[in-house]
């Protein structure tokens, strides 16, 4: 039962120095420090349950997201949780329509990252109070309640409330069987952990060999900085995994449109399933042009991790600009906005393969994609969820991978709660880890 009035919202800048090991490095982001604006909301309920939410960043700039969270905090404080979730669409609209901070969005950029962090904390709190993981909270909701969580503004030309309700009602058929399947087998995953751009060939080979031993069959390699380097690294991986296993490529927005087509034409011999983020995430027509050129070569287009909002996804789908849609649990406006994108993807019959490279993203997005299979898509064809083997040890309820699949979380909440010791050690700039690193830089 939903209970309590929110009386406190705190937000901290938490950073992990992943750049020291080249983890997360790609053609555009060469030295990321995986980071998060970490939000905790507390209520006056006697149970003492806290809601925890994050949005993912790469180090510098996290302090700006923290400021944006604080600018939105008044929308949450002194609100009864039952009033928020009882009119979740209205609350989402309130957060995203605040006239002054909206000007530095709207529904994109720093202010939308902050919105995601706040809403992720609300979903975590709600699910904890209900005693369910978020995926189960969603699966158990009746279709009308799910639809009531979604803001359909700007997407009714593609998805109306009636469309969404029809999709969800159809998804009720076979739902119990699919839930049992997920609990037994998990949701298929792919690994990005082997082939960050900053890794040496020896590291790449070592990690790839270990991944094969661990049962991984789907691999992603970062490309885009140097063509000959890409050819060499892709050859190493393809030789190791063989042609029977799946290979994807990710350029992280490095190329112009003609360059993307030319570059990928030269990498086509390695038989990638997709090229991810070949150009600017805002260039819908550019993605459509690249798609038209590469699909005949057997290469699909995947994008979405830096798509600002549901409107960009709507246009990508309308323009036939992608073959694989990549939601992000912290870029979009939390569960609410992701629901609208999952439903649009279903309407266009485009598989959803979430982005999960980053601190806490695996923990969050597993809930969304498991719900998608059970209640929306009812398909695993050409579907998989990214997995990155970094920083899970800092979470109270870390993701569980078995047989290269995400096993559905059983603990209540959104799996967003971090260990307090980890937060204190990695808080920027006053945590123990950063005091040492910053002192060393000064010397």
UniProtKB/Swiss-Prot annotation:
Single biological process term from Gene Ontology: amino acid catabolic process
UniProt: substrate binding residues: 24-26, 34, 220, 252, 276, 305, 355-357, 386
This enzyme's EC code(s): 4.2.1.68
Residue numbers binding Mg(2+): 250, 276, 305
Enzymatic reactions: L-fuconate = 2-dehydro-3-deoxy-L-fuconate + H2O
Main localisation: mitochondrion
Cofactors: Mg(2+)
GO molecular function: isomerase activity; L-fuconate dehydratase activity; magnesium ion binding
Gene3D superfamilies: Enolase-like C-terminal domain (3.20.20.120), Enolase-like, N-terminal domain (3.30.390.10)
Active site residues of this protein: 222, 355
Protein name: Mitochondrial enolase superfamily member 1
Organism, scientific name: Pongo abelii (Sumatran orangutan)
Gene it is expressed from: ENOSF1
